[in-house]
Amino acid sequence: MSDNSGSGTSPWGSLNTPVGPPKVTLAYFSNEFPPDDLNFIVRKLFDRTSKGPFCSIDGVLLCAIQFANLIGHYETTDHLFPFGSSIASVAGLGIGLVAAAAVSVTPSLADLPVAGAEAVRIAFRLGVLVDGVSQNLQPRDRSTTGTPDSWAYVIPDVSPEVVQKELDEIHSREKTPIPSKIFVSALSRTSVTISGPPARLRSLFRLSDFFRDRKFVALPVYGGLCHAGHIYEQRHVQEVVEKSVLDETHVRYSPSVRLFSTSTGKPFLSTSVTNLFEQVVGEILTQKIQWDKVVKGVLERIQELSATEVEVLVFRDSLPVHELVKALKSADSGLQTTTEDLLQWLHQSRERLQGPRGSLQSKIAIVGMSCRMPSGATDTEKFWELLEKGLDVHRKIPADRFDVETHHDPTGKRVNTSITPYGCFIDEPGLFDAGFFNMSPREAQQTDPMQRLALVTAYEALERAGYVANRTSATNLHRIGTFYGQASDDYREVNTAQEISTYFIPGGCRAFGPGRINYFFKFSGPSYSIDTACSSSLATIQAACTSLWNGDTDTVVAGGMNVLTNSDAFAGLGNGHFLSKTPNACKTWDCEADGYCRADGIGSIVMKRLEDAEADNDNILGVILGAGTNHSADAISITHPHAPSQAFLYRQILRDAALDPFDVSFVEMHGTGTQAGDSEEMQSVTEVFAPIANKRRTSKQPLHIGAVKSNVGHGEAVAGVTALIKVLLMFQKEAIPPHAGIKNSINPGFPKDLDKRNINIPYQKTAWPRSTDRKRIAVVNNFSAAGGNTTIAIEEGPLRQTIGHDPRTTHLIPISAKSKVSLKGNIQRLIDYLEVSPDVSLADLSYSLTARRYHHSHRVAITTSDVAHLKKQLRSQLDSADSHKPIVAAAGPPPVAFAFTGQGASYGTMDLELYHESKYFRDQILQLDSFAQGQGFPSFVPAIDGSFPKEHTHRPVVTQLALLCTEIALAKYWASLGVKPDVVIGHSLGEYAALHVAGVLSASDAIFLVGQRALMLEKKCQAGSHKMLAVRASLAQVQEAAGELPYEVACINGQKDTVLSAAKDDIDKLASVLESAGYKCFSLDVAFAFHSAQTDPILDDFESVSRTGVLFQAPNLPVISPLLGKVVFNDKTINANYVRRATRESVDFLSALEAAQKISIIDESTTWIEIGPHPVCMGFIRSAVPSIKVASPSIRRGENNWQTLVQTLGALHLAGIPVDWNEYHRPFEQALRLLDLPTYSWNDKTYWIQYNGDWALTKGNTFYDAEKAAKAPRVGGDLPPSPISTSTVHRVIGETFDGTAGTVDIQSDLMQQDFHDAAYGHKMNNCGVVTSSIHADIVYTIGRYLHTKLKPGVKDIHMNISNLEVVKGLVAQKNRDVPQLIQVSISTEDISSGTAQVTWFNVLPDGGLDEPFATATLFYGKANDWLQSWIPTTHLVLGRVHELERLAEQGVANRFSRNMAYGLFARNLVDYADKYRGMQSVVLHGLEAFADVELTKEKGGTWTVPPFFIDSVAHLAGFIMNVSDAVDTANNFCVTPGWESMRFARPLLAGARYRSYVKMIPTEEDAGVFLGDVYIFQDNKIIGQVRGIKFRRYPRLLLDRFFSAPDAAKHGGKHAPAVKAAIPPALEKKSAVVVAQVPVVDKPPPTKENAVAAPAAKSPEPVAAAAVNEDSITVKAMALVAAEAALDVSELEDDVQFANIGVDSLMSLVIAEKFRETLGVTISGSLFLEYPAVGDLRAWLLEYYG
């Protein structure tokens, strides 16, 4: 409270205590956002936040808003800042109390930003702490959307004593763990607020009679628990606050203003700012809010001051403010009370800040660069070599540009010729790695080479900058832009214009250059192509700096490009007197300078604001201090330079950068080598940087000048960035290269006193070392023929010192590429680097290659501890690089499974390096230990931190809690690295950690269960009386050997791994007997015999405390249960009885894994990580799933934790699991440096369209010669407009009607957007497949059209699609540039019959039709008849639905959520687009299921019955056949060729809800074929049916063969399909023969071009067996055939017919696929029809394969 007199004085001052009755000012800082739209934004922010503590963001934003509005209020009003006075007061709630504390210690408004920053720091750390603690009580469910769960409920009209009594009774009765207790967190006169974990709050109001009958409101408290004295301690407070910097500043920050405690209403009594913040944070964490006491305290303060006027400052109105103001107004009738809203000024102010940001802008750091310069300068090192040698690299115009002999005329008399034959050119500008940049050869060839090389150099510059997308805030993809200068379009105008094609515009127009860079890297920031003629690239860089200064971007890639191919520009510049006729680059500053020499060049740099670059740990090559552009408006002509304009710009740049001209020690001049240009520029430079009058440069202030054009010519649009890269290299090399432009003598127009001015032209390489007393600062100047001038001031980058050290001694060195050629090149480049850098830090190398590089599909990863070993391994990898298989990106990363180790892996004291050296891991352990101690358990840290000897025996409760919490902390550590499980399994005690990670148990509850169980064991069981014995034998072997000896089976871990429990003496006897029988035995170091009768005394009590003290939640990912031997998905299975049984009953690890395999939850692609102190489960897993590729531990006993982790990280990386390397290195990043490593080794090929001849009009194209070439078919050809057109029916191409008969033919193009999207909405094997629902929509459309044409008066048309049979499926091709046409015909002989026939065809390239691939019969019917016919069936089907529901509640049937159902569907076969995903939940039991369906509201196209509607209600059958554990989905997949009938009596409506039911039954004729009837219900009535839907089982081996795009071989598909069909030929008619695909081998015959047909007249001659090499393809092929047919090879005699030994159409396809996979021989299954006898095939194989 303060006096507010003295109006009109600056608001930034402070006040003394006034004399007389004061006006009292009280500021209230709320704990809620103002009710403006920001509130909505922050809630949305919570919804979208995928990781990290939301409450820290919430708190930071709230503080920032309050401080900003407080400052804005006082700056825009005439009010004085009142809080410098000791009579002012502040109050606040929650985070608002932190903001209030900052205001209370601030002497003036000018000092508030510093105090505010301190408050923001504390608010952020407080939020992180609260989130971490709260997540261990109840993890936030990220899978849900909408309003998050509240941690606090307010109950009105109830006594706090009554509430507390009720809570105490509940906690006592239910034995609630202390951290999980519900508690009173706030009191007011009218209400009580209770807080706790959201699930427990919901349970309280659901189960307690007292609370259930009360009104309550969930508060918007989403971040976690505060005001919880039973959870937080003083150490938490100190962890948040640490020491405030405000106690150490020169400004006197002190707690001089009264701040009211929200728990006592009394002012905080603090001795320092740190102490005040500690009290405030302690108040928020441990004390309940009692706002009535604050109101009372305020009233007492007003009475104490005898105040007559009170002003209450608020951030909008709120309930606490209302109560306070009401109390003030009723307390004293003489007290005048006013309220001032600190947000009101925002709405009253009309002024907006305009104009530039001023000179105090951020410096701009250049953090990466790359170039392609003339004469082989393919990187910056080669460019420097060229410069330091002083080379002039001009040459004659090369033949790949144009014919210099015909296009050059030194006399200038011939029209359109060049006066000079010279230029400076990039070698082989057509070289490009098209595959790397996802460009087809055709697109690459038609794309301007300068744009291609801009893309390449941008990548290299980013690579050298250590760029990884979204690694930091400055590398957020939405905040990165590209800026490139380009002043010509030669390639488009000349080369591609000869034959204009698809990419003429996107490959040649300037805007696409930077745009393509943005698109490739997925930058969402701006992209600019800027043309200012010769200054384009430097002006572009200046524009990029402006973008950074204005905050439009945080990172920019900028540069320039120029590749010369057009003779017109040479002719034009020559005629304009710009070019030199003589053989030189540019004779810059020479007396005979007569013009410039044109040049190629590409340059790219990466820039950030300096503070961002330093925060990102970047290498800073140079720092831009200022940049500007102006125009020579007063020049004598537009092309003539103007010294005064240039000088004006220099002074402006120096002024803005706060530089003295003498600070500049080098000027890189434009220096084109023209008399006028050189003289004008020298005049401006000498005038500003080296004047002769007044102050002069001393001998210690030399100014060197240079011009790179004398070396590499004038690159025009690239000239500026070329000069800038030269200066950056000079900083790096600490040298100035020699000037090469003066061939004779110096320009006579230059000042004669250059030496007096201390201006130096370096004729030799000159040292330019870094010095401690003076920074090296350079100016780069560039001007334009169009009149512009651009100048940049740049200084050397700062030297950065490492802080701390990296304790890790083992490091991962990964190398990757997009092709094998590049992988080998990258390996060789790293070997070469290590040869010249033998002392490189491996820590820096690992950091640079992991956290600061992109990772591509071809990968190598080496774990190493020294450089010599690394080089040896690299050479080994180089030799084997050809055998590396790439990661298939399209398939996504493989699933990850966490296996949590049981107690058998425990050992005395772990002494983990992770605990000592990883702050994140240690913090997790300490937080979990705090929970354990808070529940009354002893600290388990001594079992982890090494404070006891390794052999020390801790109490069981300590050992078991240490194991649990180590595993939880390890899982969290992996999660922090971005590695999260898709499925979990826990072995014995490890299951508790697994259940926590799966979301079933909170960390607090897991600790409670394990701790209670351990205490019960200690109390009720005798330690050491029983033992556990691991035996390397199967259970059957143990039973046979042990005979009648007493024991119990504790664990079945594998086929040959069994663990037994028994009394100690019995175990000893058992071990002796088993070892005598030859079985290895190991006694486990455990105190008790788990899973045995020894645990019986604790079971009842343990189940009781588990039931009342713990909340079991639904798992958020599959849990493989070793107790049940199945996978758990639902929320009913795991409960108190489950953990009881898990304590007593056997661990059947083997059966659990087998069950998970059976339903494809795990398979050979699953990546396993063992979570525990030593790997135990890995062996069991490898035994159960022998084909798995990765099963790695987190920690290994006796091995440094980092070494184990690095090895596992390497395995994950090679498996394609994304790792957050940034997070892995974060704790040590200040000790690490980004190395300037070799850039990517490109797999370059030449893409170049040669300019031909001397053309004018035709320009050498052959378009008209090829005019008669066949055109690609178009939908419908040249036909009039179609009478119908939908998303799947595009054109009617023919129709005939004759009375009641009619035929309609339509064509559709799969490549049309809606059709294409519909196909890719049903994706199989990463291909778009035209599902039967799409065919159905076509039939409904054309069927309605046919009926309307023949019976135009009928409106109510209902159709039954019957006998649909798809004999050859339809897969969308990859190439969308050409049509993919189908034709569908519908015909009826008499519409009155109510039937029509439908046939589908593929349209061939020549416009003809292929054989029909599908047929159906259409029946027209009446909906009411259908509805009546279904009534008798309804109750039977509903009865089955209810039975399934009952089975699901009992945990017998499986219930799947929408995400889980479609996730499994996608994993096993079909990846549906979102609008196809109508099933909201599925209950599945065996081959029977029902689904609740909600159709999408989004139609997105023109449909008769949207395919995604049909699929949503019908594909439950496919879900059963491809997900159910009753089907072997690991080895087979199932697809449908059609159905008997599909009809809907009511239309399927967007957004409507339905229920589908189906039971699939194997047919008697063929066990591999299944039939079922799908019923569709709405409001318990059957409204639709798909009767007789058929599914056929096929080996998964054939998936590629059946579901590959028809053009996959041409367009980079994974496999070239041998057949067009997506539906396997086993369902085809006998007449449908698949055309053979000739095998692909190195020998000539087996190719499409020179295929050898099977002889028609005679069979191949039999071949003697002796002539066959046993290692030959033929021998291996015949062995493979024999194995598949279950025969001995000797039975395959030449006269044996394949048909007689069971090689049918299906087996032939399987054999063909195995030929391809095993032998590399690609054939069609029909080969066995062409060569029906063994001898025929053997002879064919020998002929072509040997």
UniProtKB/Swiss-Prot annotation:
Residues 4-227 are annotated as: N-terminal acylcarrier protein transacylase domain (SAT). Residues 361-796 form the Ketosynthase family 3 (KS3) domain. It catalyses: holo-[ACP] + 8 malonyl-CoA + 8 H(+) = atrochrysone carboxyl-[ACP] + 8 CO2 + 8 CoA + 2 H2O. It comes from the Eukaryota. Gene3D superfamilies: 3.30.70.3290, 3.40.47.10, ACP-like, Malonyl-Coenzyme A Acyl Carrier Protein, domain 2, Polyketide synthase dehydratase. Pfam families: Acyl_transf_1, CurL-like_PKS_C, ketoacyl-synt, Ketoacyl-synt_C, PP-binding, PS-DH, SAT. GO terms for molecular function: 3-oxoacyl-[acyl-carrier-protein] synthase activity; fatty acid synthase activity; phosphopantetheine binding. Disruption phenotype: Totally abolishes the production of pestheic acid but does not affect the production iso-A82775C, another precursor of chloropupukeananes. Transmembrane segments: none annotated. GO terms for biological process: fatty acid biosynthetic process; secondary metabolite biosynthetic process. The modification O-(pantetheine 4'-phosphoryl)serine is found at residue 1705. Non-reducing polyketide synthase; part of the gene cluster that mediates the biosynthesis of pestheic acid, a diphenyl ether which is a biosynthetic precursor of the unique chloropupukeananes. The biosynthesis initiates from condensation of acetate and malonate units catalyzed by the non-reducing PKS ptaA. As the ptaA protein is TE/CLC domain-deficient, hydrolysis and Claisen cyclization of the polyketide could be catalyzed by ptaB containing a beta-lactamase domain. PANTHER family: FATTY ACID SYNTHASE, SI:DKEY-61P9.11. This is Non-reducing polyketide synthase ptaA.
